[in-house]
Amino acid sequence: MPRLSAKFTLELSAPCLIAWPEEEAPRVTAPYDGLQVETRLVLAQDWRSKAKDDPDWTTTIYAIELTVSADELDSPPDVIKTPDNQRDLRPQQEYLDAKLPKYQAAAIEISNRVLHFFQYRLFTPLVRPIPTWDQALHNPTWFDADGQELSGGTRTIVAQPVPGLRGELGVRKLTPGEFPALETYIVEPKEPSLAITLLSDAQSAWFEGNLRRAVLELAICTEVLVKRRFFAQASPAGAAFDYLEDKAKVSVRVLELLDAVAEEAFSRSYKKQEPSNYQSIDHLFRCRNKIAHRGELSFRDDFGKSVNVDASRVETWWQAVTNLKAWLEEL
């Protein structure tokens, strides 16, 4: 059975620290779904550091090189010589294109296992999984059983997703109409409010796929929006409320403030005026509590049914919070 190998070199989103003896960095070989994957950590050559008592130099891993190999039932086709002495790579390209998905899947899985180890075992900051659109995943170097490079591998360009291109979670484009505001901001910058900062953090977490953090940031943002509107910090009432809340003498739920308390204070009830968005805020806080107490991204609806939370639902909650922000500003 002919041996086929694909070599992927994947650059990391953040450098991972390594303190290793002078010899070459470690390699790990492991099976995955019928394939053999050799992982080599690629070390930076432009810097290293060594404290007085350190036995080895410290540097960073900036890439992971994975060689994925398998025994195939069929051999790669030879490159065809055309009558005009040109090389026809198409048969070999088609062969390698058909083989790519399983080799690619192994490279993604093993590389992300390495990154998970650094993120959660060694607590390396800013580590992100290798995305499926990474160009290197689609353009490996192929080798036959003799270690000879196969020239039929295609060069594929994969478009990187642009967060917010379709306007998700309030993303807007700079247009001629917005340009005067940019000019003004450059001359007179303004610090964003705490609520806006929290909303932005929730948005970033959502685009990163960190839904737990997005939910927590949204819930905190909602509390800040509501309590600062009802109990202005600069007012005696606000100072009194903060004191009593800090001393655990008073506990007022956001949902109560948005219904009966709002109707008493402002003759308007968010629950009555925006029932769908009010329900979204309710579910947001139920999920926040589930995360805080059990770490689970879910909540129970009014019928006691457990509901798993996905990106679409968090997007709905984000829109409800922005709707609530606008409603509060009108009071």
Place the predicted regions along the sequence by residue.
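Helix-loop junctions and short alpha-helical segments
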Residues: 129-271
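Charge-enriched, short contiguous segments at helix-coil
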Residues: 48-60, 76, 84-100, 268-331
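Long, contiguous, compositionally biased segments that the model treats as domain-scale units
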Residues: 1-125
